[in-house]
């Protein structure tokens, strides 16, 4: 059955000697099943393909390429595609510079790129492979000694979820920030440790955990809380992928460094 939108993340059964094709705006994923072998090919799209889609095609339609990868797994049948967040922090460059005045709070909805993960199901379930779906650039965040390697991309700051267009290759992160200081909080770069976030699936959008940041000033600890329940912006959300590095409760030390760097203090 052909699928579009976030339905491309439904479990699938790939028949023997057939190919499954997931097509995203900037990348297509091909998976062929032959006996206990899984053949996988990831190709960049020459142009934006628009909405995501999934379908089963004949082997004769698979692209000729030397880049096919081959995996062995004795279980067969149902495969689980999953959206997962990148393996490094993401530095986001907003489309405009904003300043949060002292004593004020705001919420933004940020669109984070997701990766494609394919796993087998059954008793011997295993991860087969992961692949980025967007073009990300490597960037260094922080000073030369204590900084870290990140993924970088430009983004738009949404004030309401209604302005976010549904997309199967992006997850929405609600970020609430309180400026509990007497200092202006300037937004020039936003660094998010996405490896601490899970992904949930709603009826319209993919979501991450909500983040709640309390800024105390450039020389004081800043608090960041990861809300582990699904965000309350859609009904009947279900978890689809866990955080790579789960974090619990309020995070003081790491949060201060993140906010200190991304606001250029």
Kindly give the residue locations of the regions a language model identified.
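Interface-prone segments of viral and bacterial extracellular assemblies
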Residues: 1-265
């Amino acid at each position: 059955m052909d699928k579009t939108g976030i339905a491309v993340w439904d479990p699938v059964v790939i028949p023997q000697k057939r190919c499954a094709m997931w097509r995203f705006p900037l990348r297509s994923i091909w998976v062929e099943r032959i006996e206990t072998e899984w053949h996988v090919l990831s190709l960049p799209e020459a142009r934006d393909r628009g909405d995501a889609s999934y379908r089963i095609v004949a082997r004769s339609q698979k692209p000729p390429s030397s880049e096919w990868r081959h995996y062995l797994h004795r279980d067969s049948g149902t495969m689980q595609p999953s959206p997962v967040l990148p393996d490094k922090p993401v530095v986001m460059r907003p489309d405009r510079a904003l300043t949060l005045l002292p004593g004020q709070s705001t919420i933004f909805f940020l669109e984070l790129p997701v990766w494609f993960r394919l796993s087998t199901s059954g008793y011997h379930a295993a991860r087969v492979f992961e692949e980025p779906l967007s073009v990300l650039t490597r960037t260094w965040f922080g000073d030369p000694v204590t900084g870290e390697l990140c993924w970088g991309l430009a983004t738009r700051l949404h004030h309401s979820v209604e302005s976010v267009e549904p997309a199967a290759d992006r997850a929405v992160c609600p970020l609430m920030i309180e400026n509990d200081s007497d200092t202006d909080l300037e937004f020039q770069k936003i660094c998010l440790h996405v490896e601490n976030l899970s992904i949930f699936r709603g009826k319209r959008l993919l979501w991450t955990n909500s983040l709640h940041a309390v800024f105390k000033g450039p020389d004081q600890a800043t608090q960041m809380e990861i809300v582990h329940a699904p965000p309350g912006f859609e009904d009947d959300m279900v978890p689809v992928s866990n955080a790579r590095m789960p974090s619990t409760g309020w995070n003081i030390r790491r949060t201060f460094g993140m906010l200190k760097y991304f606001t250029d203090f």
